[in-house]
Amino acid sequence: MLNSFDAAYHSLCEEVLEIGNTRNDRTNTGTISKFGHQLRFDLSKGFPLLTTKKVSFKLVATELLWFIKGDTNIQYLLKYNNNIWNEWAFENYIKSDEYNGPDMTDFGHRALSDPEFNEQYKEQMKQFKQRILEDDTFAKQFGDLGNVYGKQWRDWVDKDGNHFDQLKTVIEQIKHNPDSRRHIVSAWNPTEIDTMALPPCHTMFQFYVQDGKLSCQLYQRSADIFLGVPFNIASYALLTHLIAKECGLEVGEFVHTFGDAHIYSNHIDAIQTQLARESFNPPTLKINSDKSIFDINYEDLEIVDYESHPAIKAPIAV
């Protein structure tokens, strides 16, 4: 048996495996892909942290709070031992004149196929992370990912150089004009794509208020189904909870709409392992603070009664 959250995710995986198109991709890994899909999660029934594999709430929450703070430097994430953005910052570093270590070209693929190189890569990454944490000047130069999510959410700059805080504006709109159809935040800024370490995969979200409940719909242009989507589901569910609390509302639905939803060819075995598992009951979320969404910390958040199967490792495509 599967709870409704795991069942929705499993249905996406199964459909892509069954009818998806085999495609090449930017990372030269290869994918099975479906264009256009939608999942719905009733947040009143629990918190959608998948249980058929362990998903780290700490990683989900610290990344989201990083976005909310408008931060774009991995130093904040590394202080919470959150490594999910390391590869993109590291790639910029090894391409710079500052780097003088062993050749790290195409480290993502080489680390998977060459054990000796993998040890070199892990050592270089370890040194890189340590310098980011200990050397603020180095972190400022090589830890920053450019104008990624947090920058667009909190400090969108228009063609005239005016700065606009999308997230704060949307929260005020929800409070004062809940029926508006303009509760939208976009991370997709076409004029700044080239200034981002990775263009936004989850590109735009919209809020909807009905009967005192706040719902959120995300449009995700590109979705790594195995590694990314479980985090994205939990992240936007958490964002919905935080904004609902900020606005004095209950939570409604999280609606997840996909463009290119894909399974990487080297994730298929891992996906099939997960699909063979039964689920546990979903956990619940507690927000143990009355702080503003802009001041809340990871330590103020708590996941209650989370039981899951073990995590399943798979390589990230860079």
UniProtKB/Swiss-Prot annotation:
Location in the cell reads: Cytoplasm
Q: Which residues form the active site?
A: 201
Q: Which residues bind dUMP?
A: 26, 181-182, 221-224, 232, 262-264
Q: Which GO terms describe its cellular component?
A: cytosol
Q: Which reaction does it catalyse?
A: dUMP + (6R)-5,10-methylene-5,6,7,8-tetrahydrofolate = 7,8-dihydrofolate + dTMP
One Gene Ontology MF term = thymidylate synthase activity
Q: Keywords of this protein's UniProt record, alphabetized?
A: Cytoplasm, Methyltransferase, Nucleotide biosynthesis, Transferase
Its Gene Ontology biological processes? dTMP biosynthetic process; dTTP biosynthetic process; methylation
Under SUPFAM superfamilies, the record lists:
Thymidylate synthase/dCMP hydroxymethylase (SSF55831)
Which enzyme class?
transferase
Enzyme Commission no:
2.1.1.45
List residues binding (6R)-5,10-methylene-5,6,7,8-tetrahydrofolate.
224, 317
Q: Which domain of life is it from?
A: Bacteria
Pathway the protein acts in: Pyrimidine metabolism; dTTP biosynthesis
UniProt family annotation: Belongs to the thymidylate synthase family. Bacterial-type ThyA subfamily.
Fill in the subunit field for this protein.
Homodimer.
Q: What does this protein do?
A: Catalyzes the reductive methylation of 2'-deoxyuridine-5'-monophosphate (dUMP) to 2'-deoxythymidine-5'-monophosphate (dTMP) while utilizing 5,10-methylenetetrahydrofolate (mTHF) as the methyl donor and reductant in the reaction, yielding dihydrofolate (DHF) as a by-product. This enzymatic reaction provides an intracellular de novo source of dTMP, an essential precursor for DNA biosynthesis.
NCBIfam families documented for this protein = PRK01827.1-2, thym_sym
Give the protein name, as stated in the record.
Thymidylate synthase
- Organism of origin is Staphylococcus aureus (strain Mu50 / ATCC 700699)
Q: What is the phylogenetic placement of the source species in the record?
A: Bacteria, Bacillati, Bacillota, Bacilli, Bacillales
Q: Which gene encodes it?
A: thyA
